[in-house]
Amino acid sequence: MKIGILSQNETLYSTRRLREACEARGHEAVIINALRCYMNINSVQPSIHFEGNDLTGFDAIIPRIGADITFYGCSVLRQFEMMDVFSVNQSIAISRSRDKLRSLQLLSRKGVGMPITGFASKPDDVPDLIKMVGGAPLVIKLLEGTQGIGVVLAETQTAAESVIEAFMGLKANIMVQEYIKEAGGADIRCFVIGDKVIATMKRQAADGEFRSNLHRGGSASLVRITPEERKTAVAAAKAMGLSVAGVDLLRSERGPLIMEVNSSPGLEGIEAATEKDIAGMIIEYIEKNAAKKNRRHLQYQ
């Protein structure tokens, strides 16, 4: 098969591993920088051009779209979908997962456990907003932040009010969430492919830090999850419509709570922690499902 990997940087660990896994299984891998693509949108034969050439003959696409290029990256991916190319994750599912508020609303609708969350732009009663999520300590997040950036732990009512008012002064949309103290600065990353959790790791925040992101100095280790945690992770990915996802959850006194569903989960930390060939599993998923799509397409021609 000819498999395209939408990635801005071919030297990134995840991109390299996916290319290696493609080639190890006898497939052709092509790295495509979505920002350098341009599209011909028409009702007869939509196409994508890259470096002066038509991008044709692809059997599947693996989208590794950075948060900063979500709009354009999803536009390019949508064009591939219009050309009837199989995508590991569809553009609409990626868009859902990148909108933090929308993703939480979808999880809420499906009854998936998550921290109590408030959303505001210019609340006229900041103390009531804080009270709504259980009071201090609480977590305050910028809606557009990634990798732990724009996330603040406010330990007192006064600190919370000050941070919220500061963000309001920047005309930023914010979320406030209850702080899950019993999680102890740790979360669990569940790697979902299809309807299965195929790998898990525990991420522990560094000393003096409450954010467990590996980019923030957190550490990763093996962890065994419960059947309830497994079911919750799969349900969260399904709520977004994602076939491949990194689902982050917290262990709380009332069960697993979803923090985030990532449509382009990194491979480096979890492959190192679990010693599993996750890149290979993604390619295996493509082999099984792209073939099904192609068979269905032939039936309807």
UniProtKB/Swiss-Prot annotation:
Its cofactor is Mg(2+); Mn(2+). It comes from Photobacterium profundum (strain SS9). Binds 2 magnesium or manganese ions per subunit. ATP binds at residues 141, 178-179, 187, 211-213. SUPFAM superfamilies: Glutathione synthetase ATP-binding domain-like. The gene is rimK. Belongs to the RimK family. It comes from the Bacteria. Mg(2+) 2 binds at residues 260, 262. Mg(2+) 1 binds at residues 248, 260. It is an enzyme of class 6 (ligase). GO terms for molecular function: ATP binding; metal ion binding; ribosomal S6-glutamic acid ligase activity. HAMAP family: RimK (MF_01552). GO terms for biological process: protein modification process; SOS response; translation. Its EC number is 6.3.2.-. Mn(2+) 2 binds at residues 260, 262. PROSITE patterns: ATP_GRASP. This is Probable alpha-L-glutamate ligase.
